[in-house]
């Protein structure tokens, strides 16, 4: 593919060049979270900041590790993963926020996705809808181990990936509200844990790239608990999810070294 960057050594969107990032990348959505995550690394350095894509690189347990933000939704997340892969990355850990869908999934909990419902559009331009969006078992196990070690309350299971934030929160206002509501009820009955906006695209793109990808989320709130009259505070502190993601990368580094 032609590189449209003025500096052709750098990827067009993320403005990063080969050699500037590690094989392990932690991927928040919000560029503002990158510096906070990078503080967990040794000697973190700001590599680039362009559009929604901010990248830091530092060291963790002797390995180069990067943090790159993706913005909101599947399209920009897929762009980031594609361009990071071209720079040498092959292991991706998504960290973000989600809304709980089951009564037992409470605000402040951590959800670790084993797979995603493909209710978004990006993944459909990579693979037929019959192809499942599943996380890497290695990354998922590393996330579970990190969550256990940190002592947080965590859940593993399927999440829903959507394109429209307000389609979830105000379905009655949408011309296709009947479809959104019916599918929401179906996902709940199937045990879907939470709703977010990126993981299906990331898991499918990872499959195309033969890369490893996993995802963990802070549960900010749960509208289903609110409907049941249960406690439903809004939680904004993502530190626990960040620690889980960083801990997972540590676990992956250790396992990868043991295999060498």
Question: Predicted regions: what is each one?
Answer:
Residues 133-191:
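Active-site rim beta-loop-alpha module in soluble metabolic enzymes
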Residues 142-150, 205, 244-255:
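Generic non-transmembrane alpha-helical segments
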Residues 90-91, 193, 212:
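Short acidic/polar active-site loop segments enriched in Thr and Asp
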Residues 200-233:
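Zn-dependent metallopeptidase/amidohydrolase metal-coordination segment
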Residues 223-260:
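His/Asp/Glu-rich mid-to-C-terminal helical/loop segments that flank catalytic regions of hydrolases
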Residues 1-142:
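Metabolite-binding pocket within alpha/beta catalytic cores that recognizes anionic/polar moieties
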Residues 28-32, 72-79, 87, 105, ...:
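Conserved active-site and cofactor/substrate-binding residues in soluble primary-metabolism enzymes
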Residues 44-49, 151-158, 253-260:
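Flexible, glycine/charged-enriched surface loops at secondary-structure junctions
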């Amino acid at each position: 593919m032609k590189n449209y960057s003025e500096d052709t050594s750098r990827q067009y969107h993320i403005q990063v060049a080969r050699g500037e990032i590690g094989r392990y990348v932690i991927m928040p959505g919000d560029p503002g979270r990158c510096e906070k995550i990078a503080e967990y690394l040794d000697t973190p350095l700001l590599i680039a900041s362009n559009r929604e894509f901010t990248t830091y690189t530092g060291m963790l347990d002797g390995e180069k590790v990067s943090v790159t933000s993706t913005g909101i939704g599947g399209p920009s997340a897929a762009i980031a993963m594609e361009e990071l892969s071209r720079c040498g990355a092959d292991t991706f850990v998504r960290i973000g926020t989600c809304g709980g869908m089951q009564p037992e999934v409470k605000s402040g909990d951590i959800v670790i996705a084993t797979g995603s419902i493909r209710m978004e559009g990006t993944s459909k331009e990579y693979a037929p809808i019959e192809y499942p969006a599943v996380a890497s078992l290695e990354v998922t196990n590393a996330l579970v181990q990190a969550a256990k070690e940190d002592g947080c309350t965590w859940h593993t299971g399927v999440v829903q990936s959507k394109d429209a934030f307000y389609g979830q929160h105000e379905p009655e206002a949408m011309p296709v509200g009947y479809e959104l509501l019916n599918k929401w009820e179906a996902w709940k009955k199937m045990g879907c844990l939470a709703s977010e906006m990126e993981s299906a695209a990331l898991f499918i793109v990872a499959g195309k790239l033969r890369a490893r990808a996993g995802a963990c989320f802070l549960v900010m709130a749960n509208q289903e608990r609110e409907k049941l009259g249960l406690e439903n505070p809004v939680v904004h502190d993502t530190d626990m999810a960040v620690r889980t993601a960083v801990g997972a990368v540590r676990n992956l580094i250790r396992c990868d070294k043991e295999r060498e």
